Amino acid sequence: MPGSSTSSLDRIRSDQLGRLRAGLPAVLRSNRFWRQRLHDVMGWDDFERLPLTTKADLMADQQAHPPFGTNLTHPGDRYVRVHQTSGSSGARPLRWLDDAESWSWWRRVWADHVYRSAEVTPADRVFLAFSFGPFIGFWSAFGGAEELGALAISGGAMTTEQRIRTIAEVGATVLCCTPTYALRMVEVGREIGVDVPGSPLRVAIHAGEPGASIPSTRAAIEAGLGVRCFDHTGMTELGPTGVSCSQRDGVHLIESEFIFEEVDGELIATNLGRWGSPLIRYRTGDRVELRREPCSCGSPFVKVVGGLRGRLDDMFTVRGVNLYPSQVEDIVRRHPEVVEFMIEHRRLRHMDEVTLLVETTDGQSPLERLRSDLRQALGARINCREVPAGTLPRAELKAQRLRRIADQ
């Protein structure tokens, strides 16, 4: 790809506007949800006047018109797949439909952008360490591997030990899972005496959490699995939005398939290949810093500096200092004796109190160093408390690192 330049940006913008204008007529004609909110778009000024859309808007629509809402451009019998959001934020999950064309788009974006950016080829064997539930992320990874021509290997209905042994037995070279689950595989591999770094794995693609863009977490995974990590971003209702490149200093957003904006530090996205249930100017809730500059990987696409480091609703406050779980994780993962952690945030007499709960390896207590490192790096005093092994939850999908406790 050519390097980022004015000419490449002009080309990207022209292609985006062309695809938007090609897709909108059918939406305006038959999609009840968008017909009330949109008008025809002739140029970028028209586009920027369109209203922002929120997840609350989508949830309200599905509650008013169950089970799938009114964001449907085609008759119901045109749709071939249904998935739903993880519901990890505590909210009711969204259900999302795809027609055959939209699902083909998902697979193609994974194959052409996510896998190729992670240097995955048709010769690879891709192991997908997840259960085949309604969450779309790894279904699309499986379909993308097929689209690429790689061997797609399901890790469904397996224990972590079985997955580790299967990876070695079948010669898997690529792993797809959450960052938290990758660290769980490292932990279990050590417990059962398997040399996981000695397996054929060479690449790991992570999604669902910011971990693969957090330097200390990425380093722990790479050392523990013997792989090179790549971060992937996406949303069930939106699509596969980005992937880190060989430089791994951020995530390139896939501008050939989406329109991206940064509004008050939040990522706003419009998909351009999912017209059966499109999203236009959608507030993702992800806090970002976008930067457009030449990248040595050759991508012309805008970069999220440091990756998606957190969601706006994940912010918590310690004595007036605003923090995100990813900032705490970056410090915690520098201490290899910490096996798992959880942040507890509570209000006591109108004051914020934060406690970091940690599980550690036998006989090693890093609490004093942790307290000191957290205070020095974040400018906040955070209580640290060790808990017995096995106390904190292990997650296969998105890990919840922040536990909010009601006012006392």
Please name every model-derived segment:
Residues 121-122, 324:
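Helix N-cap / loop-to-helix initiation motif
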Residues 1-116, 121, 199, 350-355, ...:
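Nucleotide 5′-phosphate-binding alpha/beta core
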Residues 37-39, 47, 114-115, 145, ...:
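Hydrophobic alpha-helix position signal
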Residues 1-26, 148-408:
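Active-site glycine/GP-rich loop and adjacent strand/helix microenvironment
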